[in-house]
């Protein structure tokens, strides 16, 4: 029995011998996609368009990119609210999968159309889809309320005025005049310059912002699959640059990377639909058979929702 278990583990998780690692610079240059024609991209809602593609070089890579017009009348952002019994830097939010977050916001009569994961968080005990209390790692604001203090990492911030920016935030940062804020690990793109990185490949979530602050780009890269091996953070920066961003942040990734929306065309009451193929259970599905195992969703410490409110 032990031999069978070991063989199955090898079959499901071993990377093919043909996979070759290259330098981050070489990978970024080879993986550059053609420019996206956003005028013909799929419109999910007014001001929200979706582009999906599958690259074959330098490795199989499947990407989802949502472009959000922050100047679209009535467009609002929200995030996971802080706990009623909130304790700063200890117990700040309750984990939810991105789809459960979308569902719960709609139950609150807030018609979220698009949702995605954001901040890193700890702890995240197994099973990874359980809704437990957790602490966010970085500055976070939800509907004007401070959720987590800054820790010297870059943040995406949208003010109550509608203006947006990306900046490094520390413990002195307050929630004054801020609608929402989420934080990531590091800049992958800064002032139009792609930031260097290692060559580790993972599922990724990245946020990009155009120089004028109008366009928010949400880039999700699937990984740990035979059909999509993941990306480096330098690749994220290169792609965001080509997609029109001036700054970009590498957010929480791995099994947390999720993009979903409310598809009004689906039958039944639950119209939440995944747009990527997350690996929330932490498994590596690196053979064709394993890749057919489907998807698993992780409960994240912070999710972002896009909805519309009458101006």
Task: Briefly describe each language-model feature range.
Residues 80-88, 171-174, 220-225:
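Short, solvent-exposed aromatic-acidic interface loops
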Residues 116-200:
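Active-site-adjacent helix-turn-beta-strand microarchitecture at beta-sheet edges
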Residues 1-6:
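Sec-dependent signal peptide recognition
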Residues 69-71, 157-163, 169-171, 209-214, ...:
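Short acidic-glycine loop/turn motifs at beta-strand connectors
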Residues 125-150, 193-211, 215-246, 256-311:
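Conserved, well-ordered active-site substructure
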Residues 7-149:
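Zymogen propeptides
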Residues 49-67, 179, 183-213:
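Conserved beta-alpha junction segments in alpha/beta enzyme cores
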């Amino acid at each position: 029995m032990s031999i069978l278990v070991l063989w199955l583990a090898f079959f499901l998780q071993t990377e093919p011998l043909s996979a070759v690692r290259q330098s981050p610079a070489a990978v970024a240059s080879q993986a550059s996609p053609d420019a996206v024609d956003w005028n013909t991209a799929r419109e999910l809602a007014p001001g929200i368009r979706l582009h999906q593609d599958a690259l074959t070089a330098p490795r199989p890579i499947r990407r989802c990119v949502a472009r959000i017009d922050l100047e679209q009348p009535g467009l609002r952002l929200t995030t996971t609210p802080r706990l009623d019994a909130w304790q700063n830097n200890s117990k700040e939010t309750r984990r939810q999968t991105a789809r459960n977050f979308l569902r719960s916001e709609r139950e609150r009569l807030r018609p979220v159309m698009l949702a995605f994961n954001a901040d890193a968080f700890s702890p995240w005990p197994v099973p990874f889809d359980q809704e437990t209390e957790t602490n966010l790692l970085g500055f976070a604001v939800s509907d004007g309320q401070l959720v987590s203090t800054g820790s010297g990492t870059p943040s995406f911030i949208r003010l109550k005025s509608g203006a947006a920016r990306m900046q490094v935030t520390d413990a002195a940062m307050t929630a004054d005049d801020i609608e929402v804020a989420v934080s990531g690990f590091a800049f992958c793109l800064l002032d139009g310059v792609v930031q260097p990185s290692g060559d580790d490949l993972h599922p990724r979530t990245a946020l990009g912002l155009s120089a004028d602050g109008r366009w928010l780009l949400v880039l999700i890269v699937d990984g740990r699959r035979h059909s999509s091996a993941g990306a480096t953070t330098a690749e994220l920066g290169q792609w965001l640059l080509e997609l029109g961003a001036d700054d970009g942040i590498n957010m929480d990734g791995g099994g947390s990377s999720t993009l979903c929306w409310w598809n009004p065309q689906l039958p039944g009451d639950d119209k939440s639909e995944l747009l990527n193929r997350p690996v929330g259970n932490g498994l590596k599905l690196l053979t064709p058979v394993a890749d057919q195992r489907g998807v698993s969703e992780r409960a994240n410490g912070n999710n972002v929702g896009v909805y519309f409110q009458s101006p």
